[in-house]
Structures are given as structure tokens and as C-alpha cells.
Regions:
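N-terminal secretory signal peptides
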Residues: 1-14, 40-41
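A general, composition-driven signal for non-globular sequence regions
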Residues: 6, 10-11, 33, 63, ...
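Secondary-structure boundary/capping motif
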Residues: 11, 219, 244-246, 380-384
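Divalent metal-binding pocket/active-site signature
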Residues: 168-170, 178-264
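N-terminal hydrophobic targeting/anchoring segments and the immediately downstream early-domain regions
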Residues: 14-205, 260-282, 286-407
């Protein structure tokens, strides 16, 4: 659908409705120099001169924005242990000032995308996140059902969605039930290498989905846990799509048609089969995932949204940023950051890893906490309707996850 209602009016055409809207936004704490009021554009934060349209602000604030991979505050490599870990483990470490940064970001649901190298490690991670949410009930809820999305639509709290980036913690099929009961609502089958379920995209040989992997998918879909194929290799991805009987997801992956030759991206065949199952694919905001070389801009990210929309419909595209709140702010050429990059993995060159001139991994313009507004502006530029933008910002994730969890 095309919506040209975003055309900026000139000063003499400012309506009474616009003026009332401007006053409401001012009351919400926006910084609005007088000329910007007349153009219906507003500054969201004092430290930046970036201005956003009234339409973009309305869309973000009127949507439960879901990022299916946003690691909260994990990637500030100059701070060890990561702030996320400190906040989970130290009483009262998360402050009102920290909350304000999250509250004003535009994100409403964080898929925290933890690693699960073992059963015991996954239990510990789940316990820490459950403890964190319980420690700050005035600010956070754990998202595990459709009713939680409905709740977030009416209050200012933020949802924590417990998901893992592999399934190594499932020692037996019954462990799926155990972790569902503890709050886990999504799991990738594999990370980068081969495990008991299938092969990740860095595996030397893609052996496809194993019998055990098929059993895990069946149990996940029975209990209502989302099957995530983000890091799975090609044959494993296609096998899993064939084995699934209900919607599955790709939490964060680019389109191979837009980034040719990138094995971490999904082919059109995969995207079509995902859509036929009713699934959704999250578009990342990391330079080396959306384009094989520099320069990279937000327009390259938008190209992936466009490709999914044109191939299977806007109903199957969402956000899967693969960043933390502040956009993985530290340059990767810092000593601390180099320790966090798993470049010693076999076949790491398949990532086509590269950073910008500033050493940062996040796409410029999407490298800050309020990037949801920049994404909304970009989708407006691409002439999507308000309804379609709302779907891509969060409505699609809300629909598919509610369906999966509602078994």
C-alpha cells in the first residue's frame, strides 16, 4: 500500500490539528524550536540536532516496537562485565537514569538473544533474567503470551523476551518443556557450527536437519516455543522449513538477493517457504550483514525490508537488529572489542566481516538508542502506509509470536 500523507506542509498550511498535535508532543518532553513546529518536525533529544516528523513519532509511539535480537546492553566492550550482566547480578544496579534511556528509545520488546552452551548455563541465564524482571516490576515484564503484548500497548513498561541463539541446552526433547515452563519462548536450532540438531552456516559441511532436530522442532511447536532459523545453514534451514507444521521465524537475517553470496543471508526460496508457514524475518542493522562492503547506509537496510515486502508481503518483515540498545557503540578495532569477535571460528570469512571508517559495526544512523525513529522515517521515505510500517515495526512479530505461543 502507498501512503503519501507524509508530505511536509509549509507554514501557511499548518492546521489547528497540527498545532494541537505539536502541543501534545511538546508536553511529552520533545525539544521543539519554533521553525520546526511549523514544519511538523521535532527534536527528540537535546544532545542531537536530528529532527523527526510528527508521523514517524506517532508511528513509533503508537506501536509495540519489537526487536527480536537486541542484546539489551551487552556490547559496550570497554565495560566488563557487560552492563547487562551487572544489572542482572547486582541489586539496585539498574537505576532510574538507565530506565529513562530505555523508556525513551522507542523499543518496547527486547529479544535478548542469549547463548546457551550448556543446560546448566541456560538455567543460570534464565534465572538471572527472571530475577532482573522481578527486581524491577515497575519497569519490566517478561513477555510470554499475547496478553503481554496487549499489556504493553497500554502502559510504558518494557518487555523482556527470553530467547536463545542455539539449542545446545536441550539435552532431551523433554527439556523443551522445562525451559518453556521457565519462560523461554524462542530458540535457534543452531548457532554457527554443527550441533545435534543441524548445521550452522559456518559448518564445514551442512548435514541438514537431524532426526533429533526434527523431534525438537515437533516438541517446540507442540508446547508453543518459536523455532528460529537465523544462523542455520542452507540445507538445515530448508529441512527445518519442510519439517515445520506451524509458523517458524528468522529472528535476524538479511536477504541473499540483496547481499549476493552472503551465506548468512536467506535465499528467496527460504523466504517464500517461511512466509507460506506464516513466519516473519527480522532485518539486521549490522554493516557486514546487509552489504558485503563499504559504504553502508540506512538505505541498504531498507532495501532488505523492501525485498521481503516485494517477495512475500510486508506481513513477513520485522526488526532483528543484532545490536544492543546503544548500537554496539564501541569501535571494533579497540583492544576490548577484538576479544569479543569470534574471528578464530572456522570459515569466519563467510561473514564478510567489515566495519566502517569509525570502526563501528552498526549501520550509520542506526547506531544510537533511538534508531526506531530513524527506521520509521526510512520506511516513510519508501512510501509505505502507516498500517504497513506498524506491522514492520512490531505488529508482525506480535502476530506470529502470539500465534505460536497460543497453542
Amino acid at each position: 500500500m502507498i501512503d503519501d500523507s507524509a508530505t511536509t506542509p509549509n507554514a501557511r498550511n499548518v492546521s489547528r490539528r497540527s498545532a494541537v498535535g505539536a502541543m501534545a508532543l511538546f508536553a511529552a518532553g520533545l525539544v521543539m524550536p519554533a521553525p520546526s513546529v511549523l514544519r511538523r518536525r521535532y527534536r527528540l533529544f537535546a544532545h542531537s540536532t536530528t529532527e523527526y516528523s510528527e508521523r514517524a513519532i506517532r508511528l513509533v509511539r503508537g506501536t509495540v516496537v519489537v526487536d527480536m535480537l537486541n542484546q539489551f546492553r551487552f556490547a559496550d566492550t570497554a565495560i566488563r562485565p557487560p552492563l547487562s550482566e551487572q544489572w542482572k547480578r547486582k541489586p539496585n544496579a539498574f537505576t532510574a537514569a538507565n530506565w529513562e534511556e530505555y523508556r525513551t528509545s522507542g523499543f518496547r520488546v527486547f529479544g535478548v538473544g542469549e547463548g546457551a552452551s550448556s543446560y546448566d548455563g541456560a538455567l543460570r541465564t534464565i534465572a538471572e533474567w527472571n530475577g532482573f524482571v522481578a527486581a524491577y516490576p515497575q519497569w519490566f515484564i517478561r513477555v510470554g503470551g499475547a496478553e503481554d503484548f496487549a499489556r504493553l500497548a497500554t502502559d510504558e513498561k518494557i518487555g523482556i523476551l527470553l530467547d536463545f541463539q542455539n539449542a545446545d541446552h536441550f539435552r532431551t526433547v523433554d527439556d523443551v518443556d522445562t525451559f518453556w515452563g521457565l519462560g523461554q519462548r524462542s530458540s535457534q536450532l543452531t548457532y554457527n557450527q554443527t550441533n545435534r540438531l543441524g548445521s550452522g552456516f559456518l559448518a564445514e559441511t551442512d548435514g541438514g536437519l537431524t532426526d533429533y532436530g526434527a523431534q525438537i522442532i515437533a516438541r517446540m511447536q507442540k508446547v508453543g516455543m518459536a523455532v528460529d532459523l537465523a544462523h542455520a545453514a542452507d540445507r538445515t534451514t530448508l529441512d527445518a522449513l519442510a519439517a515445520a507444521t506451524k509458523p517458524v521465524i528468522v529472528s535476524h537475517s538479511a536477504c541473499r538477493a540483496v547481499a549476493p553470496g552472503h551465506l548468512r543471508a536467506k535465499t528467496d526460496e527460504m523466504i517464500v517457504k517461511l512466509a507460506k508457514l506464516g513466519g516473519v524475518m527480522g532485518i539486521p542493522m549490522i554493516r557486514f550483514m546487509v552489504k558485503l562492503d563499504e559504504p553502508v547506509t540506512i538505505e541498504n537496510v531498507l532495501d532488505h525490508f523492501d525485498h521481503v515486502a516485494k517477495t512475500v508481503g510486508v506481513e513477513h518483515a520485522g526488526i532483528g537488529g543484532d545490536l544492543d540498545l546503544v548500537g554496539n557503540a564501541n569501535p571494533v578495532n579497540s583492544a576490548e572489542a577484538k576479544q569479543e569477535i569470534p574471528s578464530n571460528q572456522p570459515n569466519f570469512d563467510r561473514y564478510h566481516f567489515h566495519a566502517g571508517p569509525d570502526g563501528k559495526l552498526a549501520v550509520p544512523g542506526l547506531d544510537h538508542p533511538k534508531r526506531t525513529y530513524d527506521l520509521a522515517e526510512g520506511l516513510i521515505r519508501r512510501k509505505y502506509s502507516d498500517a504497513d510500517i506498524g506491522l514492520m515495526l512490531g505488529g508482525n512479530w506480535r502476530r506470529v509470536l502470539s500465534s505460536i505461543w497460543g497453542v
